[in-house]
């Protein structure tokens, strides 16, 4: 087995093509050699292009490539100032959506993912992964620009693949269609029971299904591209059991662990997983469960609070606990039709603004292309917007029109000359006769090829049958 020194030398030899060492002046007999012009040029350009954010490698050398961060902690929205601004002002607010509607949409999307995972018989980890991906995605994109119904189905489909419990798009579509019908029944005041849901059947495979499936696949690709394919999630569920075992409540108080587990799953409807680490969330769930069970207990608080041993502050624990308590203060489920109508109105306004901006840009470009001293006299309508343009704005169109007119004149003169000398009808008759002959030849060739092909197939089948009867060991069937 090679020693550590040999392994290190081998590694240094392998990375020589990928890294560049800093040129240092050599010392000979205490005197420093003067730097060459090439070395000075290389060192100056190297220092200019140096990236101070890249940490040195294990061999004391600096790589030329940048760092690629695939850690899921990069999605904590409280690490830098830019992320804090984004979590306080999501992209949906820029498009005119209110803060209350935006929070209702997040709650509605996560609730649909949770119920869909139950109907698809997915594990709870898959449901948690889908909800966290949904939250991450809509902190980068707007609810107004991208339909949340497509994102919900895409998150379910993607989470099932991540947790190695894949489901087909058809199954996801059936489940979402059923959830939508159940929500309509609930909003209309009907009770959800076997009698009201007996007539619910899976939707037919029609164009609506094909379009929805295509939207689902496109949304899945868009989510992956937006998140940079960093879709793995750290779930705090195992940490709850580990912390409970450390506190000694695993065997004595299983109700606290169950209540903490429930708080963890319900907290997925909020954005606490975008703000805090899993260790902090696990401590907050245990902290809240120990105070809200039937027989509350006091967890260790001297000489310091028990959660400080897990690198968690009391401020974060209290903030998460208050957010979870506020979640249970919600009395009504979000009204899906009302939210959808509000989003459609905002989308129509946004589309009208984009059309107006585009029409203005086109008008400005046409004004620049028009010759000086000429003013536009006609209008061109795009959607509901109109703009004035010059009738002679495109020379290509004008030239093409003149060429068409010239061609028509030539055809008219040719027909007149043929009629005068009496040769027009005869020429047309000869042309038709020639076309018919060509068609007959083509049909004759096709029939000949098909007959020869049928003859070959028939002979081959007869030869195969003879060979089978000859090689078969079964006695021939008697004739009656």
From Swiss-Prot:
**What happens without the gene?**
RNAi-mediated knockdown causes abnormal male tail morphology.
Basic and acidic residues bias located where?
33-44, 384-409, 418-442, 454-472
One GO term of the biological process aspect = regulation of transcription by RNA polymerase II
Q: Name one GO molecular function term.
A: cyclin-dependent protein serine/threonine kinase regulator activity
InterPro entries referenced in this protein's UniProt entry, alphabetically: Cyclin-like_dom, Cyclin-like_sf, Cyclin/Ssn8, Cyclin_N
Compositional bias (Polar residues): 45-58
Query: Any idea what this protein is called?
Result: Cyclin L homolog cyl-1
Q: Which organism is it from?
A: Caenorhabditis elegans
Q: Gene name on record?
A: cyl-1
């Amino acid at each position: 087995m090679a020693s550590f020194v040999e392994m290190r030398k081998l590694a240094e030899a392998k990375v020589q093509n990928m890294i560049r060492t800093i040129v240092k002046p050599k010392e000979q007999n205490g005197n420093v050699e003067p730097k060459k012009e090439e070395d000075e040029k290389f060192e100056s350009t190297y220092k200019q292009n140096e990236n101070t954010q890249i940490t040195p490698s294990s061999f004391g050398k600096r790589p030329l490539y940048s760092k690629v961060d695939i850690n899921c902690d990069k999605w904590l929205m409280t690490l830098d100032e830019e992320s804090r601004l984004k979590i306080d002002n999501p992209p949906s607010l820029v498009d005119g959506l209110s803060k209350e509607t935006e929070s209702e949409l997040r709650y509605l999307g996560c609730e649909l993912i949770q119920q869909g995972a139950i109907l698809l018989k997915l594990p709870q980890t898959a449901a948690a992964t889908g909800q966290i991906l949904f939250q991450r995605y809509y902190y980068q994109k707007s609810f107004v620009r991208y339909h949340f119904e497509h994102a919900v189905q895409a998150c379910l489909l993607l989470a099932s693949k991540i947790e190695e419990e894949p489901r087909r798009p058809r199954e996801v579509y059936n489940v979402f269609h059923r959830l939508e019908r159940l929500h309509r029944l609930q909003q209309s005041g009907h009770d959800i029971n076997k009698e009201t849901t007996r007539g619910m059947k899976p939707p037919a495979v029609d164009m609506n299904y094909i379009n929805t499936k295509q939207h689902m696949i496109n949304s899945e690709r868009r989510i992956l591209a937006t998140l940079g394919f960093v879709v793995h999630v750290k779930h705090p569920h195992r940490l709850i059991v580990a912390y409970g075992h450390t506190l000694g409540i695993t065997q004595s108080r299983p109700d606290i662990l169950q209540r903490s587990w429930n708080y963890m799953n319900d907290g997925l409807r909020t954005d606490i997983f975008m703000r805090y680490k899993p260790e902090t969330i696990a401590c907050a769930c245990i902290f809240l469960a120990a105070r809200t069970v039937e027989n509350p207990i006091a967890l260790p608080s001297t000489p310091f609070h028990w959660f400080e041993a897990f690198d968690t502050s009391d401020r974060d624990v209290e903030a998460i606990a208050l957010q979870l308590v506020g979640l249970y203060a919600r009395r009504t489920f979000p009204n899906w039709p009302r939210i959808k109508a509000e989003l459609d109105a905002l989308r129509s306004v946004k589309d009208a603004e984009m059309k107006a901006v585009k029409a203005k840009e086109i008008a400005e470009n046409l004004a620049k292309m028009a010759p000086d001293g000429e003013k536009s006299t006609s209008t061109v309508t795009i959607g509901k917007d109109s703009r004035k343009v010059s009738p002679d704005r495109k020379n290509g169109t004008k030239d093409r029109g003149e060429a068409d007119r010239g061609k028509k004149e030539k055809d008219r003169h040719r027909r007149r000359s043929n009629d005068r000398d009496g040769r027009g009808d005869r020429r047309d008759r000869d042309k038709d006769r020639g076309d018919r002959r060509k068609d007959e030849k083509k049909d004759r060739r096709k029939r000949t090829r098909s007959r020869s092909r049928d003859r070959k197939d028939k002979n081959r089948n007869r030869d195969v049958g003879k060979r089978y009867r000859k090689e078969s060991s079964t006695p021939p069937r008697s004739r009656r």
